[in-house]
């Protein structure tokens, strides 16, 4: 399935069925009763949904050996990022790709808004 190496299709299907069963075991609350009773039922339902989501993530990481979501990309602080066009930038859209330059002392880009 979907080109996953190392994962058998049966394990993936079994995991998906288990997670589907968890979500089906918590149907949305009914619309009967007073406003306060409905609000309490929705609050408890949302809490159960959060617990099911947490359990599902743990099941995915345990059975499939990987997290449910990709690891976020670590970026340097915004203060250190600059656009440096001292060299001939050219008109090509791909020039300089793959070689990002990070200057430690960045020039002031935004000033007070007054021209000198």
UniProtKB/Swiss-Prot annotation:
Pfam family, one: REV
Cellular localisation: Host nucleus, Host nucleolus; Host cytoplasm
Main location: host cell
Motif stretch (Nuclear export signal and binding to XPO1): 73-84
Entry's Gene Ontology cellular component terms: host cell cytoplasm; host cell nucleolus
Annotated segments matching region Disordered: 23-48, 92-116
Record keywords: AIDS, Host cytoplasm, Host nucleus, Host-virus interaction, Methylation, mRNA transport, Phosphoprotein, RNA-binding, Transport
Gene3D superfamilies: 6.10.140.630
Motif Nuclear localization signal and RNA-binding (RRE), residue range(s) on this chain: 34-50
Molecular-function GO terms, alphabetical: DNA-binding transcription factor activity; RNA binding
GO terms (BP aspect): mRNA transport; viral process
Regions of compositional bias (Basic residues) in chain numbering: 36-47
PTM notes: Asymmetrically arginine dimethylated at one site by host PRMT6. Methylation impairs the RNA-binding activity and export of viral RNA from the nucleus to the cytoplasm. Phosphorylated by protein kinase CK2. Presence of, and maybe binding to the N-terminus of the regulatory beta subunit of CK2 is necessary for CK2-mediated Rev's phosphorylation.
Residue numbers of Phosphoserine PTMs: 5, 8, 92
Chain positions covered by the region annotation Homomultimerization: 18-26
Disulfide bond annotation, renumbered to this chain: none
Keyword Transit peptide: no
Similarity comment text for this entry: Belongs to the HIV-1 REV protein family.
Record's function text: Escorts unspliced or incompletely spliced viral pre-mRNAs (late transcripts) out of the nucleus of infected cells. These pre-mRNAs carry a recognition sequence called Rev responsive element (RRE) located in the env gene, that is not present in fully spliced viral mRNAs (early transcripts). This function is essential since most viral proteins are translated from unspliced or partially spliced pre-mRNAs which cannot exit the nucleus by the pathway used by fully processed cellular mRNAs. Rev itself is translated from a fully spliced mRNA that readily exits the nucleus.
Entry comment, domain topic: The RNA-binding motif binds to the RRE, a 240 bp stem-and-loop structure present in incompletely spliced viral pre-mRNAs. This region also contains the NLS which mediates nuclear localization via KPNB1 binding and, when the N-terminal sequence is present, nucleolar targeting. These overlapping functions prevent Rev bound to RRE from undesirable return to the nucleus. When Rev binds the RRE, the NLS becomes masked while the NES remains accessible. The leucine-rich NES mediates binding to human XPO1.
Self-association state and partner proteins as the record states: Homomultimer; when bound to the RRE. Multimeric assembly is essential for activity and may involve XPO1. Binds to human KPNB1, XPO1, TNPO1, RANBP5 and IPO7. Interacts with the viral Integrase. Interacts with human KHDRBS1. Interacts with human NAP1; this interaction decreases Rev multimerization and stimulates its activity. Interacts with human DEAD-box helicases DDX3 and DDX24; these interactions may serve for viral RNA export to the cytoplasm and packaging, respectively.
Other facts noted in the record for this chain: HIV-1 lineages are divided in three main groups, M (for Major), O (for Outlier), and N (for New, or Non-M, Non-O). The vast majority of strains found worldwide belong to the group M. Group O seems to be endemic to and largely confined to Cameroon and neighboring countries in West Central Africa, where these viruses represent a small minority of HIV-1 strains. The group N is represented by a limited number of isolates from Cameroonian persons. The group M is further subdivided in 9 clades or subtypes (A to D, F to H, J and K).
Protein name listed in UniProt: Protein Rev
Species, as recorded: Human immunodeficiency virus type 1 group M subtype B (isolate JRCSF) (HIV-1)
